Amino acid sequence: MLKVIKKYRKFITFLMIGLVYTLAYPATAHAMHIMEGMLPPRWCIFWYAVSLPFFIYGLYRMYKIVNSGVPNAKVMLALCGAFVFVLSSLKLPSVTGSCSHPTGVGLGTVLFGPGVMSVLGVIVLLFQALLLAHGGITTLGANEFSMTIVGPIVGYAVWKLCRAMKVSRSVSLFLCAMFADWSTYVTTAFQLAIVFPDPNGGVAAALIKFLSIYAITQIPLAIAEGLLTVIVYNLVISNDLWKESALQ
């Protein structure tokens, strides 16, 4: 454990700085994490019900990983959770009083597969909702579905497709993280559009409006997230702390 900490002391320092910053300057978010009270009760219940099977499967995957005996598995789980927390807490102003931020789910998706991200994501979402006024409890199901279910599944599909096509590991990982981020925001835009349809154009028009709002900041953020994810992943692999596809 001490060897791992020494090798990753710079990255751990970065994570701690991000943690201190987010705790010291909590800001209310109204973008990818749908805020408390934003959704009607029936939709809150619906998204909880839809997300529950994925969460249960994620618990099963988490149990298998923790008891797998694979070296550094627990450390890598903690790293992936911290990566999601720090990146998803780095909020940037967007339009109409909202904000945008990375999701950070690409790293864990590639290391462990999309299933475990539903559990890690819920832990992060609960922490942010309770301590950082970021998201909410009633909207937890909707936020979980977009960020920790759809995002990782899309990212994992992109990763597997790229690797099957013999695309380089770094490019595959970059595309995985980027598309996981974008698909999260597309899902959130759809979740809001069906609740707040445009008076004239309906759900389709509302979806276009929400997507156009998020795209201003989220497109460059997703690209930056992809690059950072590649750097961290290559750091992990190059130091022999993990093997590709070890527990996917």
UniProtKB/Swiss-Prot annotation:
User: Disulfide bonds, which pairs?
Assistant: none
InterPro entries assigned: CbiM (IPR018024), CbiM/NikMN (IPR002751)
This protein's membrane topology, according to the annotation, is: Multi-pass membrane protein
Transmembrane region(s): 39-59, 75-95, 107-127, 139-159, 173-195, 213-233
Q: What is its main location?
A: membrane
Named in its record, the pathway it takes part in is: Cofactor biosynthesis; adenosylcobalamin biosynthesis
Signal sequence: where? 1-31
Give one GO biological process term.
Answer: cobalamin biosynthetic process
Enumerate the GO terms in the molecular function aspect: cobalt ion transmembrane transporter activity
Q: How does it assemble?
A: Forms an energy-coupling factor (ECF) transporter complex composed of an ATP-binding protein (A component, CbiO), a transmembrane protein (T component, CbiQ) and 2 possible substrate-capture proteins (S components, CbiM and CbiN) of unknown stoichimetry.
Into which family does the record put it?
Belongs to the CbiM family.
**What protein name applies here?**
Cobalt transport protein CbiM
Q: What species does this protein belong to? A: Limosilactobacillus reuteri (strain DSM 20016) (Lactobacillus reuteri)
